[in-house]
Structures are given as C-alpha cells and as structure tokens.
C-alpha cells in the first residue's frame, strides 16, 4: 500500500506575500486532507525571497498541530546548515508534544546561494554541517542526552521522532541510508524516468551497502494533477502556476550546479506531457507503473501552487482521495 500526502509552502498568489486569509485557507486545506485520509502534511522552506514562501516550518507545524488531530506533520526539509542542530532538536520535540506524537523530521543541505549569504553561512560547508548535525539531532530525537552532554529540555512523545533526509546526489542518499528512517525525493519533470534512474544508480546501491530493508521509507514529492478536466485546468490555471514555481526555483538556483532538474523549456502544453497530469485513472496507472521501478511508500502531492484557487485545490484533494488513493491501496507494493 502507498500513502498519499500533501505538500505546502503557503504561497497563494504569484509574487505576493500571503495574507492572514491565505494562511487560513492553507489551514483549511490541511484539515480537509486530514478528513480525506491523507497521511502527512509536509512543509518546505526558503529564505530571503520576495513572494512569501514559508520560512519557518516548525512554528507552522506547531500551529497545525493544534488545528488537527490525526494527520502526521513533516518538514521537507529543514535546511540544516542554516541553523543550529540543538535548536532543531528542541523545536522538533516541542512540536511532537503539541501534536501528541505526529512529527516526522526531514533535514536537507540546501543549495541556493542567497540563503547562505544572508545567514552568513559558507555553502562549501554544507557537507560538514550535515555530517556533524544529523548525528547530533538523531541522538536527541528520543529525548535523551545530546552529544554535548546536555539534556533535551522537552522529551518527545515518539521514541524516537522519525527522521528522513532529502537530496538526490550520491552523498545525501548514502547519508540517508546510513542514518535515517527514510529518504525524501522530489521529481517534477519526467518523474518516471528520473526517479527510476535515481533509485537504480544511486539510492538502491546505498541501501544495499548499509543493509537497509523494507522498513526504510521511500517518499517522493511531485506536481500531480488528476482530473476529468485535467487539460483545461492545466492550461488555464495549474500550468501557469507550475511555470511560476519553476522559474522562481531557477532564479534562486542561479550560479549553482543543478541538484534537481529545475531548468526547463517549452510552453504549457509541452510541459504537461512531462508531468503527472491526466484523468484520475490514468494517474493511478502511471503511479502504479512508477512504483515498480521506484518502490515508494508515500507520494507527496503539491496541494496548492501559487495562483491556484483554494477551492480548486480542495476539489483536487477530494479527487485524489476518492479516485487515485483507492487504486494505490488495492494493489500491494512490490
């Protein structure tokens, strides 16, 4: 069985910071996802940008913890080189207590130059920050004594809080296989090809080398749109929103080696052919085919891209829950 989850950055309109009403709409989407049986709400972060991309994941998840009761709450991912590992542990444990044990902590290295500049961090130190920070944090996720000899102020409910790591290169994949409970991947354009290649060439060898079995969670995020009116909705609303999202990523990534395939070309109709866009039955079949090559246990769907009305995003969640999720549940994972 594969679970469906949602991904949110809490942007509502292209180029505009969110209002309190926009945040309220985001909370309602999460509550709807919980009611519809989605497994997780995952958040993400960026810093120093002009369009309201969420900069503070754990505070947001603390708020969502009090507005929900069953859906799990995940960070995908906290940019560890930009913060102190102790602060991550302490805030994560508080969220786990507030949520009665529903947090999954996702960590990553980041790669956008401006974020490192505004935090006074050296991008060349990302690997060291992860190599030192991840074991420190992992030691605290059960609420015990940290490697510096000091206690965690507030022990978590879960023993331990689950830990996942992101990153599509060999080093991050190996670190996840060695230290984490799972790996968080993302793939937008040509996901069937890209994820199969990543698993075959990078992740599976790391998992085999470290003796990881079926308990290791493979999670991936993508832009998916399942609708009986998929072509029209893509052309009029979802496609322009996706292009805005990807252009902002490319803008932020300028000057850095590609770490996830953000560069793209073509118009809205050309791009549609490279994404998981189609009728619900078509999307279910494609996801089942992808699972043969990339044995994921959880699919994370962008719940609302900037510019997609909240009502349309909600209707899409209902379609996913009613027509795509049952097909994934009916056929066991390989």
Name the predicted role of every residue range.
Residues 1-73, 161:
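N-terminal beta1-alpha1-beta2 module of alpha/beta enzyme domains
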Residues 2, 84-182, 186-215, 257:
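Internal, glycine-rich beta/alpha segment that forms the wall or movable "lid"
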Residues 4-8, 41-43, 73-75, 103-107, ...:
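Hydrophobic faces of well-ordered beta-strands that scaffold small-molecule active sites
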Residues 8-23, 78-86, 158-168, 271-279:
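Active-site mouth loops of central-metabolism enzymes
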Residues 37, 45, 64, 95, ...:
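Conserved, mostly hydrophobic/aromatic
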Residues 40-64, 79, 111, 187-191, ...:
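Glycine-rich, proline-tolerant flexible connector loops at the mouths of alpha/beta enzymes
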Residues 119, 123-153, 193-297, 329-334:
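An alpha-helical appendage that flanks or caps ligand/catalytic pockets
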């Amino acid at each position: 069985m594969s679970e469906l989850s949602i991904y949110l950055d809490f942007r509502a309109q292209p180029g505009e910071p969110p209002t309190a009403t926009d945040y309220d709409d985001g909370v309602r989407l999460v509550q709807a996802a919980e009611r519809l049986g989605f497994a997780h709400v995952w958040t993400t972060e960026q810093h120093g940008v002009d369009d309201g991309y969420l900069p503070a994941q754990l505070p947001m998840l603390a708020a969502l913890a009090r507005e929900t009761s069953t859906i799990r709450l995940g960070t995908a991912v906290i940019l560890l080189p930009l913060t102190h590992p102790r602060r991550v542990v302490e805030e994560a444990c508080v969220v786990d207590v507030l949520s009665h044990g529903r947090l999954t902590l996702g960590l990553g290295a980041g790669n956008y130059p401006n974020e490192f500049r505004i935090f006074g961090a050296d991008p060349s130190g990302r690997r060291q920050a992860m190599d030192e920070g991840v074991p420190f944090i992992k030691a605290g996720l059960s609420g015990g004594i940290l490697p510096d000899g000091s206690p965690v102020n507030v022990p978590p409910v879960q023993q331990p809080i689950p830990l996942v790591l992101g990153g599509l290169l060999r080093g991050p994949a190996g670190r996840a296989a060695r230290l984490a409970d799972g790996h968080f991947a993302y793939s937008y354009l040509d996901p069937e090809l890209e994820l199969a290649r990543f698993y075959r060439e990078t992740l599976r060898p790391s998992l085999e080398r470290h003796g990881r079995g079926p308990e290791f969670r493979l999670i991936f995020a993508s832009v998916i749109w399942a609708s009986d009116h998929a072509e029209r909705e893509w052309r009029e609303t979802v496609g322009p929103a996706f292009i805005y999202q990807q252009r902002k990523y490319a803008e932020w990534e300028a000057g850095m080696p590609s770490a996830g395939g953000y560069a793209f070309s073509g118009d809205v109709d050309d791009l549609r052919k490279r994404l998981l866009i189609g009728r619900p039955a078509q999307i279910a079949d494609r996801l089942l085919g992808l699972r043969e090559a990339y044995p994921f246990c959880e699919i994370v769907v962008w719940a609302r891209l900037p510019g997609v009305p909240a009502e349309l995003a909600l209707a899409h969640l209902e379609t996913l829950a009613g027509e795509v999720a049952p097909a994934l549940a009916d056929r066991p994972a390989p």
